[in-house]
Amino acid sequence: DKAAFAFGTPSESSYSNLKNLVSNQGVVASDSTGVGTGRSELMSANYGGDKGVFAYGTNGSGRTSVKNLMSNTGVIASDVSGVGTVRSSGNGAQYGGDKGIIAYGSTGSDVSISNLINNVGVIATDTSGVGTARRGLGAVAYGYSA
């Protein structure tokens, strides 16, 4: 029943690992320095029913496949080498109650790749050819009842 914003580009030449937690009343907390390599244009999704993952994106060296798991208390873990095609600017969502999916993005060219995330945050290998290749899209979960 809470949320988090993390990472991003606060200026044109820098990448941050800042995070802002959001309470179950919708109040956004002030900046706190996060963990992991600062990057932008990353993908994120929920998994495990109450946890999240931040993955892929762009840092000062280019696109990356790094992932950071977030606990159900809002703690973001250290960088873990990712799996799948290095890309940025895709998106992700929760599905099936306790799993996630991240998809699409850009490797320099738009791609139609998806990666499933199991209920413990493991990102599966690429599945290709999933709809029209694109980047900069939105994603949401639907069909859940409160």
Question: Where would I find each of the regions flagged by the language model?
Answer:
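Polar, enzyme-active/binding microenvironments
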Residues: 1-146
